[in-house]
A protein has these predicted regions:
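Long, compositionally biased charged/polar accessory segments in the mid-to-C-terminal portions
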Residues: 1-172
Length: 172
């Protein structure tokens, strides 16, 4: 299912194929070594399987989000990418970030100061993606813009979730 979604939907768009080119270059720069290490240690293999289950669910949700925007595949790919990135940020990054922010008030203040820059990075990268789709042919800018959008989505969602969790905990 997920491979078909990637190949038949995401890679058929400029935004999706641009992001996947960057993602694959990053991912395959380290994954063979990690895969070998996991293969050699059964405990690590079990732990990685458990850690990947939420990711599979997140990717399925992203596929559903893609199909909510049937009129334009480029917009659908961006929506799917933002949904997936935001959920990855919430599921995988917000827990350790919450622990770090709860431990250090200095880091918490720094995180609060990041809200505006992260929001601007998200909006700027979204505008850049839209502009490169409209102008076409700017593959390097599209690769940069889609990657920046994913990173901004990850960061924003993790920050927001962590700060919400801390607020809820402080009310107790």
């Amino acid at each position: 299912f997920l491979r078909n979604f990637r190949d038949d939907a995401i890679l058929k768009t400029k935004t999706g194929s641009s992001f996947m080119a960057v993602f694959n270059a990053w991912y395959y720069s380290f994954s063979p070594v990690v895969a070998q290490l996991i293969q050699e240690h059964s405990t690590l293999k079990t732990a990685m399987r458990i850690m990947l289950y939420p990711l599979i669910g997140i990717l399925r949700i992203g596929a559903e989000a893609f199909h909510l925007v049937p009129a334009n595949m480029e917009v659908a790919a961006v929506v799917s990418g933002v949904v997936v990135s935001a959920l990855i940020g919430v599921i995988y990054l917000s827990t350790p970030l919450t622990a770090i922010l709860a431990y250090s008030s200095r880091i918490r203040r720094a995180a609060n100061r990041l809200q505006l820059p992260v929001t601007l990075a998200f909006l700027g990268s979204l505008a850049s993606v839209a502009l490169t789709v409209v102008l076409g042919g700017l593959i390097v800018l599209m690769m940069f813009s889609t990657s920046a959008l994913v990173l901004a989505s990850l960061t924003a969602s993790a920050l927001i979730a962590s700060q919400l969790i801390l607020r809820l905990l402080s009310r107790r």
